[in-house]
Structures are given as structure tokens and as C-alpha cells.
Amino acid sequence: ENIDPKLKYENAIKLLWSNKLDEALEELIMLKKIKPQDLMPNIQYWLGEVHYAKKDFNQAILEFGEGLKNYPDSIKGPDNMLKLGLSFSNLNNKNDACNVFIELELKYPDASKDVIQRSIKERNKLDCPKE
């Protein structure tokens, strides 16, 4: 079936927002196989988001980690890193969570205010060491 990847991507996001997580996941996995270059960083990020929403934090860590490894300079870089830290935090893995939040602020000083503020809030909540 020859469907525009952008439409498929938009549909996957709509499914995610409608809390149809399994369907969203299927769409994103299918899209990832097609590898539309311009969409790959976003597809990878949203794969992490679906697993995060399903509270499958181990899988979310793998997806956000892959996004960071493959697309560190994409617009989703800081979001990947924030959600990676939150995933570790949800698994009560304070050390890794703290390291990710600290690294986020060093690696992405120009990240959106929301991302930076959330990272700082999480670091304070976890009582992370200062450096």
C-alpha cells in the first residue's frame, strides 16, 4: 500500500493523543520500517512516548536512547533526553535519572524553557547531586 508517510505519521500521533496506544505503536513501527528520512527523528521520539504512556519504561528507555544516539541534533533531542530521565525516574533508578537530567542541561543549554524547567524540577525532586 502506497500511503504518504507524512499522513501515516500524523495519523499515528492522532491515535496516540486519543489514547489508542497499541494502534499508534503499530503505525509508528510500520513507519520506522519505511524510513522516511525527514520524519525519522520524530518517529523515534514518538515510539518512546507510546511506551512511556503505556508505562513500559524499560522499552521507553531503549527508544529514547536510540533517538538520542541516532539523532542527537534533531529538534527532538532535548525531549528525548528529558523523557529518558523521566523513564529512569519512574523505575526508581535515581542515579541514571540524575545523570541524564544534568547532562541534558549541559548538552542542550538552548532547549525550550519548558524542558529545562522540568529537568531542574525533576533534579530537585530526586535530590540529585549538583554536578
Where on the chain are the PLM-derived regions?
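Acidic, proline-/serine-/threonine-rich low-complexity intrinsically disordered segments
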Residues: 1-14, 18
